[in-house]
């Protein structure tokens, strides 16, 4: 949500979005979501910090905000006949409410697709966010698809360099594909040539 949007002038609750004394951006450390050693402060700033000074961070821990997002999603799907959502910066949100949101949408529309932009080169961290994955902490995002950034990065590098030995050129792509065993559902990995 943009800070200049009309609804930000008169929110239903003071905690409709995350409020700080001064601007606090996300630390963009979404590995704190799955790291058993992460500090609570780092996780809080990751989830609650704003993406940008003009882009407030909605407080999905507020049950009214979460319910609003569920109703909003269902309305858009019904009104426009959408087949899916792309959720940018997916791991920047509170993970449990987002999992509840995904589950609610998928329960209402089992053939719908939600793809999360999980911008990481780490294959295990990417796999963590795909729904149905056997995560050690028991977390299930209910997120059907994730964007395959490791493969995207390997394709870009592999197509733009000569093979000079193992780990270079198209061998980069092979190396990434050899890790496919960590994903719950390969058919729902979104392969893409570019982002934005």
What spans do the regions from the language model cover?
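Glycine-rich, aromatic-lined ligand/substrate-binding cores of catalytic
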Residues: 195
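Substrate-binding/active-site clefts of carbohydrate-active enzymes
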Residues: 1-75, 79, 100-108, 113, ...
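Active-site-proximal helices and loops of the catalytic beta/alpha 8
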Residues: 72-83, 89-192
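Short beta-strand segments at enzyme active-site cores
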Residues: 1, 86-87
